Amino acid sequence: MSESPKPADALRTLPERAFRARARLVAGVFCLVCCGLAVRLLFLQVLGGGWYTDRALGQQLRDTVVPADRGRVYSADGVLLAANSSCWTLRASPREMPEDKLALAAKGLAEILELDEGKLLEKFSDRRSNDCLLRYRVDRAMADAVRDFCEANGITGIRIDQDSKRWYPQGEFLASVLGFTNVDNAGVSGLELKYDDLLTGENGVVLTAVNAWGYTLEQSYETERFPTEGDGLRLTIDANIQHYLENALGYAVKEHHVAARAVGIVMDVNTGAVLAMSTTPAYDPNQPRVLADKAAREAVEGLSGDERAAALQLAQQTQWRNKAVSDLYEPGSVFKLITCAAALDTGAVSKNSSFYCGESISVAGTRFHCANHKHHGAQTVTQALENSCNQSFIQIGARLGKEAFCDYFAAFGLRAPTGIDLPAEPKKSLYYTADRMGPVELASCAFGQSSKISYLEMASAVCAVVNGGRLMQPYVVSDILGPEGEVIDHLSPVCKRQVLKEETSRTMREMMEAVVLYGGGRNARIAGYRVGGKSGTSQKLDSADEKARIASFVAVAPIDDPQFLCLVCLDEPHSWTTAGGSLSAPVCAEVLEQTLVYKGVPRAAVPDTPASDAETSADLPEDGDSFDGA
């Protein structure tokens, strides 16, 4: 028989049991903690390892972007138009700068960098900062001056990083077509914007090992991915022809005091290639925010505050705009070529159809007359074009009819963008559709008023008039180039549609030559070359100045074998006349003669003009467009 425990033994087992219980509890908690840590370690090592690795690398490595050069741009004849130049960006790391030299650094660098000394000292005094920008894209001289100053005075913590910026070696040359880039080297306007994706290269990067405070380690780790230059462009623009156009336009703008800039376009009539394009005055794309036009600059300088800022912005946007592509205008009597071609093509008239021009003509209660109320009397269609007779073209438009007129207006590409590879084309021109066109609207549209189209649309349409009736898509880039100048892609001419019969085009060439030989285009004659053309002097119907005019002329040579077209428009000239045949025709003649000689087109005999043809410019038929409400 077993003995029961003694009271002393029982008392001893109670604390032992409590101890064992506590030990088991502690062991259990310890096991749970270990399990938790194990799970956490598993998460950190396996599931979250990539994230923490990235964080660690981000703290241990500093990446410095190495900017890629943009692709270079060349003219058709190999002139470099847009390239890249080295520059330097200056940054400071206040943590690394010696504290006893902050004031000296602020004073010296403020003087070199043309910055505020107080603001620099404030930046340098922020010891928490490891990176602050001092100056963006300075030239070599300024970068060298900063380097010399820091070395001479034992100033550390100033970083000089090499960078790249866009450079236009020809200055203002072709500025409105090329456009320019912003501080980030991204295209803002012109070809720089249109082809930005192609021109932009792929940046490189340098990875450098740093310590916990962001300082570069003495025994540094560094790896580099080299930048890749963007693709280049070869243009259809010929630098020589562009030079001829810009020189002639610049002289005309000054001579005739052109208030609202001038436009010039030279095209290959058979391909649609733009050989030259200018908006004058131009600007320097190396300094695009500096107003190049003296009058605009003086107007802005006379203002202050918000008014000055708004005026400056408007003036800058105006000088950047490629007027040849982006602006709409009333083409005036140059448009009579379109009306005439459409009427001939449909058979509504022949070149010998007769019309009468009296004192005036009334259409639905509105009375129209020719410039200076001239009476041309009875005349054929050819003579009406020579004389730029409004009354005759009102009658031609009526015979054509509004439906056919609107159909040809669209067929010539005057309702929609041309599709040129330049930005900022208007989405649509201003015109009447057949359902909105009454007799008065048809009458005024027939001689080139009441519709607004772009200068490029007008030039493109006239190319179709003379090249056999084919509407070609204008373009300015012929080749995409690789970094070594090799051709990656070639852009071929595009024919959008056939607008006229070949016979109609041939007849129009004959009539346009008659305009230059016997009519309002005599100032476009070129010795030894056969030239066809048409003048225009259009009212600016949306201008507050009732006397505001656009003097224009379009010329094609050689007209018997069409190759080159030149359109010149002077917007608001203030000269002895505003007639396009007097002001713009000589500019076309100068540009085309130089172009023909440069291209090796031989001179030949031209048809004789009548012996009595001894008129001066003042005697030329005027082509002003005028109508009065009855």
Model-derived features: positions:
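Periplasmic/cell-envelope proteins involved in peptidoglycan metabolism and beta-lactam response
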Residues: M1-L303, Q319, L328, E403-G413, ...
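Beta-lactam-recognizing serine transpeptidase/beta-lactamase-like catalytic domain environment
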Residues: S2-A10, A82, N211-E224, I237, ...
